[in-house]
């Protein structure tokens, strides 16, 4: 099932909850524990990201760990183009609209486009 279909089917009549897990601040063992606990508590899926210094390897490992632990979608919450992983189920393609910096308004999105297209 595609992530969009999953979200649409889950949100009928209720709000959804997605847990943000930051591989820059959480060990692999803690990711397993947190994924299990939040899945049991009723989260609808997971977002991976947060820290600005994440490597692709850290993001890939986090996504793989969460997907092996649960059967819920893993959506990237990227802070930089270099942390776009093809192992995730989806990506939030965001734009920071309250910035005066062109880099944050469109630059990062332009830099991310080739990675998104590849995956």
Predicted regions and their residues:
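N-terminal amphipathic alpha-helix/helix-capping segment at the start of soluble metabolic enzymes
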Residues: 1-21, 25, 113-118
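Active-site beta-loop-alpha junctions enriched in small/polar residues
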Residues: 20-26, 51, 79-81, 96
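Alpha-helix-loop-beta-strand connector modules within alpha/beta enzyme cores
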Residues: 57-82, 111-119
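Hydrophobic faces of well-ordered beta-strands that scaffold small-molecule active sites
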Residues: 17-22, 46-48, 74-76, 91-93
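Short, acidic/polar
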Residues: 25-38, 79
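Short, well-ordered coil/turn segments that N-cap beta-strands
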Residues: 13-17, 42-44, 70-73, 87-89
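Conserved anion-binding
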Residues: 83-119
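Glycine-rich, proline-tolerant flexible connector loops at the mouths of alpha/beta enzymes
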Residues: 47-61
């Amino acid at each position: 099932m595609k992530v969009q279909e999953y979200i649409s089917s889950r949100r009928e009549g209720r709000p959804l909850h997605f847990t943000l897990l930051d591989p820059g601040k959480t060990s692999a063992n803690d990711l397993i524990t947190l994924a299990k606990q939040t899945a049991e508590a009723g989260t609808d899926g997971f977002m991976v990201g947060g820290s600005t210094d994440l490597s692709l390897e850290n993001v890939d490992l986090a996504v793989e760990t969460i997907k092996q632990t649960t059967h819920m979608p893993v959506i990237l919450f990227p802070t930089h183009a270099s942390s776009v992983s093809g192992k995730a189920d989806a990506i939030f393609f965001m734009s920071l609209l309250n910035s005066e910096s062109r880099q944050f308004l469109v630059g990062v999105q332009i830099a991310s486009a080739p990675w998104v297209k590849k995956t």
